[in-house]
Swiss-Prot record, chain A:
Its membrane topology: Multi-pass membrane protein
Record field: transmembrane: 5-24, 33-52, 59-79, 93-110, 117-135, 150-168, 179-199
Function per UniProt: Receptor for the C-terminal sequence motif K-D-E-L that is present on endoplasmic reticulum resident proteins and that mediates their recycling from the Golgi back to the endoplasmic reticulum.
Biological source species: Xenopus laevis
Origin organism lineage: Eukaryota, Metazoa, Chordata, Craniata, Vertebrata
Keyword hit for Zinc: no
Site note Interaction with the K-D-E-L motif on target proteins, residues: 5, 117
Keywords: Cytoplasmic vesicle, Endoplasmic reticulum, ER-Golgi transport, Golgi apparatus, Membrane, Protein transport, Receptor, Transmembrane, Transmembrane helix, Transport
Protein known as: ER lumen protein-retaining receptor 1-B
GO MF, one example: ER retention sequence binding
Membrane topology (Cytoplasmic): 25-32, 80-92, 136-149, 200-212
Amino acid sequence: MNIFRFLGDISHLSAIIILLLKIWKSRSCAGISGKSQLLFAIVFTTRYLDLFTNFISFYNTSMKVVYVASSYATVWMIYSKFKATYDGNHDTFRVEFLIVPTAILSFLVNHDFTPLEILWTFSIYLESVAILPQLFMVSKTGEAETITSHYLFALGIYRTLYLFNWIWRYQFEEFFDLIAIVAGLVQTVLYCDFFYLYITKVLKGKKLSLPA
Amino acid sequence: SVNGLKHDEL
C-alpha cells in the first residue's frame, strides 16, 4: 500500500461520510442526485461480490463493507427517510444512457469472460461516469451548497490519487490494470471543470454558483 | 504483462 492509494481511500471514505452526515444532520437531501447515489450503490455491489470469494486483508474487507453499507444508507435516506426533501425535478439525467453502454462495454472489453469478472469490469466503467447525474443537477440548478462541493471534491480527488498510485505500482511492482487506468482517467477528466470551480470559488469562501 | 486480474484495490 503506497501513500497515494491510502490517501485515495481516505478521501473516498471522507466523501461518503461527508454526504451521509450532510443529509442526516440537515434532515435534507436537497441538491443531491439520488440517481448518482443509486449508481454508486450498484457500483459497490457489483465490484465487491468478491467479499464472498476472495480475502485480501482486514483493511480491504472492512473498507468494502463500509462502502457498500453507507451507499445503501444514502440511497435509503434519499428515496425513503427524507424523500420529501429530494429534488427529483432537477434530477433528470437518463441513467439508462450510462448503464446500458457500460454494461455492453464490460462484455466486450474485460480481462476474463466470467460472471464475476464482467461484473467487476462493469462496476469500473459505471463508476467512471456515475457522478454525471450529480454534475448535471449542479449545472441545471446553477449552484451547489458548500458542503456538497466538499463532497464532490473529495470524491473526485480519490480517483485522481489512484492515478498516482497506478504510476507508482507500475514503477515499483510492475503492476498495471489497463481497464482501471483508462476508466480512472475518464473519471478524473469529468471532474476537471468542477475542480477548477472548487479551487477558484469554494476555497476562497464563495458558494459554488455557475454563470446563468 | 497485464496483471489486472488481481483485484486488490478498492
